[in-house]
Amino acid sequence: DQIFVLGGAKNKRLSEIVQLASKAEIAILEVSREKLDERTKGAHQGVVALLSSSEVINKNQMTEQQLFAYLDDNETQLILILDGITDPHNLGACMRTADAAGVNMIIVPKDKSVSLNPTVRKVASGAAETVKMVSVTNLARCLEGLKQNGFWIVGTAEKAEKSVYEQDLTGAIALV
């Protein structure tokens, strides 16, 4: 594993990254903006991590088949189900907000939804690495499976009488 940092850049955020990488004994290389641009097609904010294993990138993604086995073995309490999110910025923002709200997992349909891509990861600001994401073929069948696994399915709407913050969301809950 290596971290490439923009040479000559002096800001608190990059300094903290360099300190953490040093403590973790990760190689740190100062490089030019052109080298960073080359590695990222221009989207880097002055730092790039090169990981030796795709397992790190994919550890929070799972298939539909793995979903219910995972639920049997883990205490996932709050799931967010998103349908029709096609803009990667919107999915990234949803992931970031979900992470802050304590959501353990996000479920999206495979079709007509954006997948987890570099733009989503960037906008999610780390949430893509902490919130599990599952792409399913059939949302209705998935909801039925969640019910059979003891989840309460809670529908949300923009014009609901009560805010989501006024609801009792303890226990196994899936927000749609």
PLM region spans:
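Post-transcriptional modification and biogenesis factors for structured RNAs
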Residues: 1-175
